[in-house]
From Swiss-Prot:
Keywords: Antibiotic, Antimicrobial, Apoptosis, Fungicide
Record lineage: Eukaryota, Metazoa, Ecdysozoa, Arthropoda, Hexapoda
Domain of life: Eukaryota
Disulfide bond sites: none
Task of the protein: Antimicrobial peptide which displays antifungal activity and antibacterial activity against a wide range of Gram-positive and Gram-negative bacteria. Has antibacterial activity against the Gram-positive bacteria E.faecium ATCC 19434 (MIC=2.5 uM), E.faecalis ATCC29212 (MIC=2.5 uM), S.epidermidis KCTC 1917 (MIC=5 uM), S.mutans KCTC 3065 (MIC=5 uM), and the Gram-negative bacteria E.coli BW25113 (MIC=5 uM), P.aeruginosa ATCC 27853 (MIC=10 uM), S.typhimurium KCTC 1926 (MIC=5 uM) and S.enteritidis ATCC 13076 (MIC=5 uM).
Protein name: Periplanetasin-2
Reported induction: Up-regulated by infection with E.coli.
């Protein structure tokens, strides 16, 4: 998943 989506999900941002 994109960083932005991970931030929304509350997970660690993956680049």
């Amino acid at each position: 998943y994109p960083c932005k989506l991970n931030l929304k999900l509350g997970k660690v941002p993956f680049h």
